[in-house]
């Protein structure tokens, strides 16, 4: 399978996400899959017309985890280092690359990867992904609502 492991993003848990993503990507590669570890915020800045055969160049395209500091990220510095300087959640070519994959493995940590918004976008775009659907993610992220829902199920 051709798999995008989506990690990073603009979260205080950016570094943890890359560690998770790196381990997942390694395990998937060991099992014969073609895998790209992709930073959802930084994206891949090659021209869109050069995306053909991206999974043949997976090692070249993947985020180099050794370059990621093991300390809490300076999110202002991360924003400033994005080539296109866009504030958009998705970096260059992220959506297109995810659409080209057989599935996207969600290795994002923090609100933006777990609150259901990304899952809803992928549902609308027809992108297959791992984990909970958008509604389940949104409910689980709201701890008060999740607690009420679970307590109501006890009495059924």
Task: Give residue spans per PLM region.
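Conserved small/polar residues in nucleotide/adenosyl-binding loops
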Residues: 154-156
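ATP-binding N-terminal substructure of ATP-dependent carboxylate-amine bond-forming enzymes
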Residues: 1-135, 139-152
């Amino acid at each position: 399978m051709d798999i995008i492991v989506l990690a990073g993003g603009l979260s205080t848990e950016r570094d943890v996400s890359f560690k998770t993503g790196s381990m997942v990507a390694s395990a998937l590669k060991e099992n014969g899959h073609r895998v790209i570890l992709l930073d959802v915020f930084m994206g891949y800045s090659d021209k869109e017309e050069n995306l053909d055969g991206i999974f043949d160049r997976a090692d070249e395209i993947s985020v180099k985890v050794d370059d990621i500091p093991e300390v809490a990220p300076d999110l202002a510095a991360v924003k400033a280092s994005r080539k296109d300087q866009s504030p958009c959640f998705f970096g260059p070519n992220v959506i297109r690359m995810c659409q080209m994959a057989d599935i996207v493995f969600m290795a994002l940590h923090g609100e933006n990867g777990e609150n259901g918004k990304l899952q809803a976008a992928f549902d609308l775009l027809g992108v297959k992904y791992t984990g909970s659907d958008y509604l389940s993610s949104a409910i689980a992220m709201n701890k008060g609502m999740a607690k009420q829902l679970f307590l109501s199920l006890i009495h059924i």
